[in-house]
Amino acid sequence: MEYNSKDAEEETEDEEEGLKEAEGEEQEKEEVTATSETDDDQEDLPSVLVPTVNIREERLINLAETPAFLCLHELHSKGKLPGTRMAELKAKYTLLHDTVVSTQESEVQLLENAKRFTEQIQQQQVCLQQAEDFPNVFTTEVCKLREQLLKYQNEYTAAQEREYNIQYRLTSLTEEKSIILKEFEKIPKPGEIEKKTRLLKESTEELRKEVIQRRLEIKNLREDVVLKQKQLVREQKELEELMEYQVGLKDDVVHHQSVPVQITKEIEKMTRKKVETEKKNIVLESELKELSDSLKKLENKVNTLAEERDDIMKEVEGKRTLLEVKEREYGQLLKLLELTKENEASSLAERGILDINLRNCLIDKQNYHDELSRKQREKERDFRNLKKTELLLKVSLDALTQAQAMNQRLLLEMEAIPKEYLTLPERRKELHKEVDLARRNLAQQKSLSEAEAKLVEQQIAQENKLLKEQESLRELVFNLGRMTQIKIDEKEQKAKDFLKAQRRYSEIVKEIKSKDLEIRLYKKRKHEIHRRLREFASLYDTIRNERNKFVNLLHKAHQKVNEIKERLKMSLNELEILRNSAVSQERKLQNAMLKHSNNVTIKESIQNDVCKITAKLQEMKEKKEAQLTSMDRLASMITVIEEEMVQLRKKYEKAVQRRNESGVQLIEREEEVCIFYEKVNVQEKIKLHQDVEIHILEEKIRFLKLRIAEKQRQISVTRKLVPIKKSLDADLAVIQIQFSQCTDRIKDLEKLFVNPDSKGRVRFIKGKDLTEEEMIKKLDMLELQIAKKEEKLLEKDFIYEQVSQLTNRLKGKTQACKKDTLLLAKKMNSYQQKIKVVTQEMMALVAELSMKQALTIELQKEVREKEEFIFSCSARIEKGLPLNREIEKDWLKVLRDEEMYAFATAEMSREYMETDYRQLPNGVYTTAEQRPNAYMPEADTELPLPKPYGAMAPFKPSEPGANRRHIRKPVVKPIEI
């Protein structure tokens, strides 16, 4: 949609430029029509203003090929716009298009009606004008001067409006510059960010080192434990081998104990081996001694090993506890590491945002620098042009003074010349009259001969011929002088027109260049804005995805916590219901016992009365029977109550078991809740970071809103600048009517032009055709002019090449110097920032020092006052006088404050208890009366127990209002259990 808005803005700008061009063309055409009014009057053709209004036919447009539909399809194909949104936008666009078509049709109809009515009005106005302007049809010089005055006034007002617009643009640009500078100052400095990142890196490195050290210690302890276990296993194996060897030796001993019996039986056979056996016995005895010694040593060793094993087990347990502690610390450190990682990620994201902002600011700075340099260049160029124009003005003023002096001199000379040329025609006429008289006299003379008369007649005829030739030549000379004057005037006019055209051409070229520069600048800005928008869109997508993840996790955690709270509340409600039911049953049992004791006392009193009273024996018997029946019933009720008590005891035991189980579950859930709270804290920290980022984005949105407000303010100013909207609308309607009339007139003229039978189709141009010689001369002159212009162009090309080479060299030098200036500027900025930071720190330290000094002075004053107060109190006590009334008041105030604090704490605890009591199961607090959540069922045989209503508890209906008293009340349905 942003692209669409930008396209719409560009289209509106193009339309405004088109309207301006149309207005300029209308003015030119008005001038042309004003100049060509005389020709039109001669030809008796109706003249109509032809406005250049470009009305697009919306009915003939294919909606699928419009840029809006194409842009929507592109966005849908890229995945930026969903299908439903695209369909909605298409439907809106089609509706708007239909409304535009209908408005165009109605406008065409209205234009046709207006055209018809305007034609009638024009006809009537022509008739009225012909009637009114009968005596003074011709235009006077006063009217022309009035027209010129109005034209110059309009030009002056247009220049004033242009100047006001330029000043307004300057003010708006200065305001934008100040806003941008404020935002640039708000951006955090890179030095602070680097400090923060450095501190975070140092802390993370220290934590990493500690973690590595702890891991190494844990690893060494585990290796020691493994070595001790291996040593124990090895020693156990050696002990088992020694035990087996001992058993074997015992068997040998037993075997050898039976040998002497065999020896006694076989003395004769073993006489030879006696010595050997004795030797063997000696050896075996020595070995036995050694074995017994070794056994003792082994036993001692086993005891020592068992002691060592106990010590090692104790050490292992201690190490295990230490290991558990270290593992907990390790877990905490891991959590801290995760938090630091998350903080690092958030700081990296912030750093990315700041880098983007910094890059954008640098680009904006470069753009503003370029614009400033361009403005300076334009200023210098305008300054040069101004100097040139001033010089030209001086030259023209000097020339004007010279021309005025020449004019005065010529006027004086003309006055000095004698005015004989004025009397020449009169003298010529007089001489002609005298000559005619002489001729007549000669003709009347009769003394002349015929030959002389003929000669006289011939001379008279020759004289007449010569006079006629003289008159014709005089006329020719006069005509030639007049023609030369006309030609000179035409030449001067053409030269003036040529100079005007040249000036206009140069102005148009300058305007085109400036417009091209502006177009390039706007294109650069557009590309830069698109790039920034893409970066911000990617950042926004990442932030939105992370936020959605965290929000989902939060929702899950909240749901689990709410479920656990609801279960806990349900179990507590059940417990309260059971407790209430047990209390009510105990009360009923006590009442029954009281009734039973009362019945027993009544029975005893009745028996006493039976002994005393004999008259009422029958009645007492009946009463006795009734009492017996009631006793039976009460006994049965007691048995039922006892059974119910047994059942209640069982239920109570079950409830206790459930409570214990729920307590265990609650402990587990509390642990889970603690874990969730830790996660929630982590999520809250992340949320805080996200809130900071959102705050930054909101600041940007606020800045954009400010820009929108500025644009709206500009629009309102432009609307205020154009207060004659209604008159303009009326002019537009008139122009549209004239446009339709012009189209009709053009069609008629085209028909006349195409018609071959019309007489006025061909119009011969007045004047003489040139001869071949004159044409050849003219061509030679034109060729010479072309050759001269080509020479000048070649010279200019050569100069341009040399200047371009010089400028390229200068460009290279300037670019090399730019890098040096950039480095110097960066260093200067860094030093300035350091100086600012140091000065700020110094100022802060000075301020802290001054605050501390002020505090010390105040404390010293208080100490002096307290010492004086203590001294005065001790003096009064030594004298035996009571203390001041102020001390008593202070003590009473302290006591009153303590009482008020105790009362406030009690009130707070009471309110807290009330709020806990008023909290509903869904977590909402209420001050309304609690609805009953259980009811007592009706029962004749046994005591009823309260039963909960469940989810759909009944409510107490309010009294119907005055507007519902005529409606019948609803029938209350019985509760089915």
UniProtKB/Swiss-Prot annotation:
Name under which the protein is recorded: Coiled-coil domain-containing protein 146
UniProt KW keywords: Cell projection, Cilium, Coiled coil, Cytoplasm, Cytoskeleton, Differentiation, Flagellum, Spermatogenesis
Tissue: Widely expressed. Expressed at high levels in testis (at protein level).
Keyword Phosphoprotein in annotation: no
GO cellular component, one term: sperm head-tail coupling apparatus
Principal location class: cytoplasm
Keyword Cytoplasm belongs to the record: yes
TM ranges: none
Coiled coil feature spans: 204-238, 267-343, 631-658, 693-722
Gene Ontology annotations of biological process type: cell morphogenesis; cell population proliferation; cilium organization; flagellated sperm motility; gene expression; manchette assembly; nucleus organization; single fertilization
Example of a GO MF term: protein-containing complex binding
Subunit organization: Interacts with CCDC38 and CCDC42. Interacts with intraflagellar transport proteins ITF20 and IFT88.
Extent of Acidic residues compositional bias: 8-29
Stretches for region Disordered: 1-48
Protein's cellular compartments: Cytoplasm, Cytoskeleton, Microtubule organizing center, Centrosome, Centriole; Cell projection, Cilium, Flagellum; Cytoplasm, Cytoskeleton, Flagellum axoneme; Cytoplasm, Cytoskeleton, Cilium basal body
Underlying gene: Ccdc146
